[in-house]
């Protein structure tokens, strides 16, 4: 099992380093790469007769979720950890709007290739005029840019990538709050839109997701007393 994970990590590192360096305009056509291993985790997943069925299904599961953050954005609520007040950190997020069936069916899975038991492909989605207007609205207004990294187990598949995205967004919001808000708030809520294609790789046997956002702060609730 350990050798399989090491092999997967090395393969993904070689594949995705050149992809991370690319700078592609996202205004009209959203384009980013996704991958899924053709191998299964014993005791967690059941083998299938078609070795491509599982990775294809995984890629199609995660694509609409990521695209929702690039096309419509995500909303979030963040309660910072406060040891003195006995407040635990809480972070929740959800899509502002999910892709509908027609939009999901218009997603293109382009130029697939297999390398070292990993199925790779480019995800392409053409924005409508209304969606371009949304993107330009975020781009033209002086929204701060934030960035975060998140991690999750490779064996968790779609849930792992979703959890890593959640952590990446939380870290981006947390870093912004610590840098720009002088007094620790009780709660922050707002919305974000991905400003760059997501970077999904591996680090130490885990998914590593790096996300860049435009951010809009909708509400900051302050503590009235200590």
Enumerate the language-model features and the residues they cover.
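Bacterial N-terminal signal peptides that target proteins for export
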Residues: 1-9
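Domain-level marker for long, solvent-exposed, non-transmembrane regions
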Residues: 20-226
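Hydrophobic h-region of N-terminal signal peptides that target proteins for export
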Residues: 13-21
């Amino acid at each position: 099992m350990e050798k399989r994970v090491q092999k997967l990590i090395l393969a993904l590192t070689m594949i995705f380093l050149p992809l991370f360096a690319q700078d592609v305009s996202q205004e009209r056509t959203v384009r980013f790469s996704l991958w899924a291993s053709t191998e299964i985790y014993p005791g967690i997943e059941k083998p299938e007769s078609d070795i491509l069925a599982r990775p294809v299904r995984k890629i199609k599961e995660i694509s609409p979720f990521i695209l929702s953050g690039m096309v419509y954005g995500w909303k979030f609520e963040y309660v910072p950890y406060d040891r003195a007040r006995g407040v635990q950190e809480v972070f929740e997020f959800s899509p502002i709007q999910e892709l509908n069936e027609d939009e999901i069916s218009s997603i293109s899975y382009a130029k697939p290739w297999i390398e070292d038991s990993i199925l790779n492909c480019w995800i392409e989605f053409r924005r409508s005029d209304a969606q371009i207007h949304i993107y330009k609205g975020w781009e033209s207004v002086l929204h701060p840019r934030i960035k975060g990294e998140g991690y999750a187990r490779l064996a968790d598949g779609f849930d792992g990538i979703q959890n890593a995205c959640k952590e990446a967004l939380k870290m981006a919001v947390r870093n912004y709050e610590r840098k720009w808000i002088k007094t620790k708030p009780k709660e922050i809520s707002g919305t974000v839109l991905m400003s760059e294609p997501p970077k999904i790789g591996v680090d130490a046997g885990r998914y590593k997701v790096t996300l860049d956002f435009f951010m809009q702060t909708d509400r900051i609730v302050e503590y009235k007393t200590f």
